[in-house]
């Protein structure tokens, strides 16, 4: 019951996502220019491409499942296109070269407004599905390490930067901050992507890195050298700080790297599209994935948290695509609250 209340609190906290700043990320409260869909075609494309993080990550696992169901259940061919992270594929989505992408709720807002990790605004980004909730991330160390809590990271080597997946650094800095550790307290070892940084933990090149729970990359690294997630402080102060980012502390479910009761960070991981993708295309795909959720859930455990009640969020940070709205209205998932929220975030 307490976990359910906490998850409800996280949904509510998304509406205050944009207050304040953390780790050098500016406030994100500006309204968006929510223009109409520019692709008016009534014809479906022959294929759709989904931008994801590299193989072994949660985003890639989700994109692979969505692409497979698209290919099986429609006349379209679904393709997964992995990149170092959303920073690497966002321009392709903006230009209409990708139809969809997997991105977390904070990253989507930053991309739309050109703030935080983005030097340029990408105003055409639109939500298609609310996706996974909660998606969980934590700080991982070698199990044999004497690092037992976040404060023990002072003076240690941390994987850093992550190139095209810059949002990982934002989340990592947040987890360090709630444990009383600043970037200047650690030795920063830069990597071009998240996978390299996490593998470096097992290889002994760094002492800790951010990584998501329950993904293939964790299994791979744990096979190289047993790893362990650090327990994050489950305090009011920690949740207040994370609430600025639409996230909160949640209890980790039993999985590789969770050795005891462990608290990690949870937030929504969404499927987005753009105004360059036609209403018919987004409507068709959202309908297909909604109606074939049971099959999606056979592809990866993360789809167990890809629930219908999470697909039409009421506290979204970038607008929903008209094609998605059309479908959610048909199934009764879109309400007056959604219309009110759209007016709140759109100029």
Model feature map: region roles:
Residues 16-27:
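C-terminal segment of classical bacterial N-terminal signal peptides
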Residues 29-50, 146-157, 322, 329-330, ...:
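Immediate post-signal peptide segment of exported/extracytoplasmic ligand-binding proteins
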Residues 31-110:
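N-terminal (or domain-start) structured segment
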Residues 33, 126-148, 273:
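Hydrophobic/proline-rich hinge and linker segments of small-molecule sensing/allosteric domains
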Residues 45-79, 135-199, 203, 314-323:
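Bilobed "Venus flytrap"/periplasmic-binding protein-like clamshell domains
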Residues 45-46, 195, 203, 213-225, ...:
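An extracytoplasmic/periplasmic, membrane-proximal ligand-sensing/linker region
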Residues 72, 178-184, 189, 198, ...:
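Secondary-structure end/capping motifs
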Residues 105-107, 113-119, 123, 141-145, ...:
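Pocket-lining segment of extracytoplasmic ligand-binding domains
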């Amino acid at each position: 019951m307490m976990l359910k209340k906490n998850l409800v609190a996280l949904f509510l906290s998304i509406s205050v996502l944009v207050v304040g700043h953390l780790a050098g990320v500016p406030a994100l409260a500006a309204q968006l220019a929510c223009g109409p869909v520019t692709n008016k075609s009534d014809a479906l494309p022959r294929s759709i491409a989904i931008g994801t993080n590299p193989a072994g990550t949660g985003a890639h696992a989700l994109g692979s499942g969505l692409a497979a169901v698209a290919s099986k259940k429609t006349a379209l061919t679904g393709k997964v296109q992995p990149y170092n992270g959303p920073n690497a594929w966002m321009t392709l989505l903006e230009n209409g070269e990708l139809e969809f992408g997997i991105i977390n709720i904070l990253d989507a807002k930053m991309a739309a407004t050109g703030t935080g990790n983005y030097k340029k605004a990408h105003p055409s980004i639109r939500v298609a599905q609310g996706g996974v909730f909660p998606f969980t991330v934590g700080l991982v160390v070698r199990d044999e390490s004497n690092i037992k809590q976040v404060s023990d990271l002072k003076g240690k080597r941390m994987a850093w930067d992550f190139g095209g997946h810059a949002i990982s650094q934002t989340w990592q800095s947040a987890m360090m901050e709630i444990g009383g550790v600043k970037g200047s307290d650690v030795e920063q070892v830069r990597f071009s992507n998240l996978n390299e940084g996490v593998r470096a933990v097992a290889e002994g090149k760094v002492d800790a890195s951010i990584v998501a729970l329950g993904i293939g990359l964790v299994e791979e690294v744990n096979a190289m050298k047993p790893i362990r997630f650090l327990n994050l402080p489950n305090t009011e102060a920690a949740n207040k700080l994370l609430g600025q980012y639409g996230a909160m502390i949640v209890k980790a479910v039993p999985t590789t790297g969770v050795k005891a009761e462990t608290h990690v960070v949870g937030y929504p991981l969404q499927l987005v599209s753009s105004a360059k993708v036609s209403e018919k295309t987004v409507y068709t795909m959202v309908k297909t994935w909604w109606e074939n959720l049971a099959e999606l859930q056979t592809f990866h455990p993360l789809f167990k948290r890809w629930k219908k009640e999470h697909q039409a969020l009421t506290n979204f940070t970038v607008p929903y695509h008209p094609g998605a709205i059309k479908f959610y209205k048909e199934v009764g998932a879109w309400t007056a609250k959604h219309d009110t929220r759209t007016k709140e975030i759109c100029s």
